[in-house]
Amino acid sequence: LIGLVGSEMCIRDSPEGDFIERIRAVIGNKTMISTSMDSHGNVSEKLAKYSDIITCYRKAPHTDALESKQRALDNLVDRLKSGKGKPKYKAWIPVPILLPGEQTSTRVEPGKSLYEKVKPIADSKGVVDAAVWVGYAWGDAPRNHAVVMTVGDNKKAVVNGAEELAQSFWDARYEFDFVAPTTTLDSALNQAFNYQKNKIDNKPFIISDMGDNPTAGGAGDVTWTLDKLLKIKEFKSENGPELIYASIPGPDLILNALNTKIGDKVSGYVGAKVDDRFSPPVLLNGILKAVHLGDKNAEAEVVVQVGSIKVI
């Protein structure tokens, strides 16, 4: 489970909580449920109640996703093979902290130190697993907050482990910050222009729109930034600063591009089919630079150059 699902039918709790409650109603109380989650998800009390064993990623970025899923399976198989059955005790501590993912990398402090404490507690005698959830800040639901959980057979070890992690998280709450400089679009572009003008090195200057993030609940098709970029004079000429815009959904433009030769002109509207609150669909009139077919998700991808901007 990811812990980010939203539903108008589950405002008081969580879709994941309702989902696991219904699973429990089918399989009964004797069957064990081992749950693996994203550390940026939310863990409602109901989800915690019906999960016998629960764990989540210990790294952000989530380079340990498969490892975490494997751990959830290993925990389940171990309890079954050993005959120990369900862990006797479970601690669920909601922590009143709400942080976006961009502030919770485990590669830098304080996230690094906090998550380094998880494994020793999870491996301690009497504990089956321990986990820290940062939570999902953009969910707009009562369960939006951090959570610490431990499960095991030794009540004292389970309680003390959870309290130690929760207290460590709380003590470091003011230390979390963005892992990269943050500013306005205009300021970021000025920095990019100065970077290019001074030719500090040949590395690209990357600007990330953390607001319209489809992996965090955003539509992924907001056109506000693209519309602003297309109006900037420096990018009007094809000889201007090279800018790669990655990316914007545009099924209508895709259809036109598939019937166009590379190097020819192509046009079509892109974006704002899901979220048009801040900017409408944008009409791209440019040169078709590339077509890629076969991506399992996008199916077809194209690059259209407008001025010096290459839009994927």
Question: Where in the sequence are the language-model features?
Answer:
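Short, structured coil segments at secondary-structure junctions
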Residues: V5-G6, N29, K49-S51
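Internal, active-site/partner-interface "lid" segment
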Residues: L80-G111
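Glycine-rich, charge-decorated loop segments at or immediately adjacent to ligand/cofactor-binding or catalytic sites
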Residues: T35-D52, L253-L258
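Acidic, His- and aromatic-enriched active-site or binding-groove loops in soluble protein domains
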Residues: I53-Q70
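Single conserved hydrophobic/aromatic residue that forms the stacking wall/gate
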Residues: L1-G6, C10-I11
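Charged helix-capping and loop-helix junction motifs
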Residues: S14-I20, D221-T225
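A short helix->loop->beta-strand "cap" motif at the edges of active sites that frequently abuts
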Residues: A25-M32
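Hard-cation-handling environments
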Residues: L99-I312
